[in-house]
Amino acid sequence: LGFSKGNNIGVQHAKGEYLCILNPDTVVPEDCFKELFEFSEIKNDLGLFACRLIDGTGTFLPESKRHIPTPKVAIKKMLGFIKSYYATEVEEDSTGIVPILVGAFMMVKTNVYKQVQGFDEDYFMYGEDIDLSYKVTKAGYDNMYYGPIKAIHFKGESTLKDSVYAKRFYGAMQIFYKKHFKSNRLTKTIISLGIKMAKLFKGHTSVEKMPVNRYVLISDKNYPKLAEIFKNSFQIQTKIEVFQANTQVILDANYLSFKQIIECMSASEKNQNITFKILPKNSNFILGSNSSKNRGEVIHF
């Protein structure tokens, strides 16, 4: 079906005042929607709105807030100057108007979504969130980024980080420029260069596996089968604290709220090789992702 068509079908069956577009590889805190709803009620002319996204290591995902990828911005992005692509003028933990939000998690009033005719089904995958954000802005609404709320987007599970991704992205930009910008030699050159550069990608980029010296389960319960997997390097504690370098932290959702889990991941030292796994409620497996560039891992016990 593709991302656009699949979501539009869902919207046809939705009956609420608000719509939430949410990827399956996400984790949201318990108070997420309550806080976003309260925020939406005090903002006039609200278009799309969304929260801060982090990856499976707790690292902020800059695509949470972006600028319109005009031909000039696209050229800079291809040359490695990404500051103009991301909306860095809005701090990641603050709130502000941004042109483009990410399709992994966005909310919008149903009437606004239908007014701009929803996701454009000419896009199969990639670019549809840019197109929707741009249409909503052109209709006179403000797209809002709400940084106080954080959610996890594992990302590597729904994104192809290789030549296929690059080709699809620049193909989507070709559609975007045809629909919203006057076609000229410059835009055609940008797309042509983007597609040519995509062919130079050598496929999936592996991320170096970092050493893990200890495994710490945050829980009030013992899981003997889980302990067997990690042997002598496994320990259990009930409090979240500052972890030593090269530690993998296993967060038990039977004991911790998702808000606590997300806060723990977000607050971790990013240069200490602290990684995370989540033990979902009533489950016999842990899962997580040590890089937004690679697929995650599921360990059964």
Task: Describe each PLM feature range.
Residues N23-V27, A253-Y255:
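The conserved acidic donor/metal-binding loop of glycosyltransferases
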Residues D93, P99-I149, M265-S266:
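A short, conserved alpha-helix in the catalytic core of glycosyltransferases
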Residues Y134-A139, N143-K209:
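Active-site-adjacent helix/loop segment of glycosyltransferases
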